[in-house]
Amino acid sequence: MKLRAQFDRGTYSESKGSFKLRDSLDPMQPEPSSREGNGLSLTLQPELLARMPGAGSSSGTETGEDVRVPMGSSSGSTNGRGATSRRMRTASHSHSHTHGHGHSHEHESDSGESDLESGESSSSISELRYLLRWLKKSLPFIVILCAKLVIQHALGLAVAVGLFTTFMYVNKSIQTQVFLHDRRTNLHCAWLLLFLTSSSLLVFYTFHTQSLYRCLFFANATIDYHNFWEVLWSVGVTNFILKFIFMGFKCLILLVPCPLMTYRRRGQWYMLIEEVGQLYQVIAPVPLWFRYLVSYDEMDTSVGLTLGILLALLYLIMKLLALYGLSGSLQKTLRTFFSPEVNGAPASPAQIREAGDICPICQADFKQPRVLVCQHIFCEECIAQWLNQERTCPLCRTVITDKVHKWKDGATSAHLQIY
């Protein structure tokens, strides 16, 4: 009995050791071949089976073989769950595919637009670089060509610069003298008139062979009307001389003594002279350009003459439209010139004493004080001079008039009428 008990304890210890070793190696491993069926079978080791109740008799007969235990439900339930899981996977896959496809389409369109914009910007940059490279290579020739043109037309360019400089100087001087009002210098005004006259006569004398003075009276100058540059030259000189003539009229207005003409009336004369001068400058180049458009060489056919007449008629239509626009401005100027201009009402002595007896503009005693709608008092000449360029009160910015006559300050338009 002692020997049998020792033998049983030894056998139990060996089986326990082997069970621990098998347990570390995961005794319940599914067989790969069994995954192809509807169920799942596990392979149990003999040692694990020996510990199970009721397995004592079978353990002695099948000691060296594994036991397979099927796990899972019936084939119907297994197929149902498999189909359900497959449908869920298919639905989720289709949803993710659709969502991913929409996002991919948006990303593709955005990337296409960005690629197009980047391509356009790169092409424009490359064109700009090509242009700069071409200018860099052609710069020496451009300088040589400009030098040749300057030498060839040195006299004409010098006259053009002189006429423009004279115009800017006299125009600024006239505005300064108008602003000075009573403090203007008659000697300086006379000098401006003499300077304008001498400049005009010098130009006519220098180019006396072309008879440019005839263009002032819409007559034909002795120039080649087939040459575009000569016609353009005649138009430019005529325009500057006309500006000088009307600026001379403004100098004559400046020389009129103050008792004979008020400042407000002077401003109306300046405005009328400028409007008439601009209208005359629009009409003056018409004969020159008309003859240039209808002129033809002996080699030209009747088609060339017909085309020239058609172009001349189109030019006349354009000039008539321009004159129609200027006629409205001239009518407004004439109405302003012949209508009395009143700014405010005469101020009472009490209002003058309350204001302090000093004009806020000229900082001197009031001369013909006028009270505005805002109850501020100014000299009549001072407020008239202010309202030539502004519409509001100098102190409170209340709107006094809705008209601004910009030519009342003696300025002359710098626009060069070349057509």
Swiss-Prot record:
The UniProt record lists the keyword Oxidoreductase: no
MF terms in GO: ubiquitin protein ligase activity; zinc ion binding
Annotated spans, Required for ubiquitin ligase activity and for protection against ER stress-induced cell death: 352-403
PROSITE patterns from the UniProt entry: ZF_RING_1, ZF_RING_2
GO terms for biological process, alphabetical: positive regulation of ERAD pathway; protein ubiquitination
Membrane topology value: Multi-pass membrane protein
Underlying gene: rnft1
Protein name: E3 ubiquitin-protein ligase RNFT1
PANTHER family according to UniProt: E3 UBIQUITIN-PROTEIN LIGASE RNFT1, UNCHARACTERIZED RING FINGER-CONTAINING PROTEIN
Composition bias type Basic residues, residue spans: 84-102
Pathway: Protein modification; protein ubiquitination
Annotated EC: 2.3.2.27
Annotated localization: Endoplasmic reticulum membrane
UniProt keyword list: Endoplasmic reticulum, Membrane, Metal-binding, Transferase, Transmembrane, Transmembrane helix, Ubl conjugation pathway, Zinc, Zinc-finger
A GO CC annotation given for this chain: endoplasmic reticulum membrane
Species of the source: Danio rerio
Enzyme class: transferase
Catalytic activity: S-ubiquitinyl-[E2 ubiquitin-conjugating enzyme]-L-cysteine + [acceptor protein]-L-lysine = [E2 ubiquitin-conjugating enzyme]-L-cysteine + N(6)-ubiquitinyl-[acceptor protein]-L-lysine
Signal sequence, start to end: none
Region listing for Disordered, in residue ranges: 1-120
Entry function: E3 ubiquitin-protein ligase that acts in the endoplasmic reticulum (ER)-associated degradation (ERAD) pathway, which targets misfolded proteins that accumulate in the endoplasmic reticulum (ER) for ubiquitination and subsequent proteasome-mediated degradation. Protects cells from ER stress-induced apoptosis.
Transmembrane segments: 141-161, 187-207, 217-237, 240-260, 270-290, 303-323
